[in-house]
A protein has these predicted regions:
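Non-catalytic substrate-recognition and accessory regions of acyl/acetyltransferase enzymes
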Residues: 1-91, 102-117, 121-127, 135-168
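Glycine-rich phosphate-binding loop
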Residues: 94-99
Length: 168
């Protein structure tokens, strides 16, 4: 299985990166419909260490299919379901999108595109979140191979030059 850091950003996120649009935002009513479907699914045990810096949250994969959910104290507060990424308003801005995106990508073979999907759209904010997640995956991989390297000035430039396709 390929890890997210082993893919170019284009392979990680798909060709939809070229045309972000706010029209692609998941509304709260759309999210409510998806949440009702997700509530009926059986979930895996929480993924260890993915949310180490965000206590009170857990990420789990659906036992069937490729959905990934972010659980808070009161149940699902975010998801990557199909090609839809959403986090409830009260939980945004807490650094939760990066671990959710990376967990979904790991489940899907290194890309966030679910099986059978070749094009996925993004809002500008969603595209930025996916870029941040992809960079984070590369930095984590680099830190495992070259401890201390990512803490040096210009680390992301080094990573982009040395590892396959951190840019488009």
């Amino acid at each position: 299985m390929t890890a997210p850091w082993q893919k170019s950003f284009l392979a990680f996120a798909g060709p939809g990166i070229d045309h972000p649009s706010d029209a692609l935002r998941v509304t709260d009513s759309e999210a409510a419909d998806i949440l009702s479907t997700l509530a009926a699914q059986t979930w895996s045990a929480p993924i260890p260490a993915r949310l180490a810096r965000q206590p009170g949250y857990a990420i789990c994969h659906a036992c069937d299919g490729f959905n990934t959910a972010l659980f808070g104290p009161d149940g699902i507060v975010g998801f990557y379901a199909g090609s839809y990424l959403w986090i409830a308003g009260a939980h945004r801005g807490k650094g939760l999108s990066t671990p959710l995106i990376l967990a979904a990508a790991e489940r899907r073979g290194g890309s966030i595109l679910p099986p059978g999907i070749v094009l996925q759209g993004y809002t500008p904010a969603g595209l930025a979140a996916h870029r941040k997640a992809h960079h984070q995956a590369i930095l984590e991989a680099t830190e495992r191979v070259i401890p201390g390297r990512v803490r040096r000035p210009g680390a992301i430039d080094f990573v982009q030059l040395r590892l396959a396709g951190a840019t488009r």
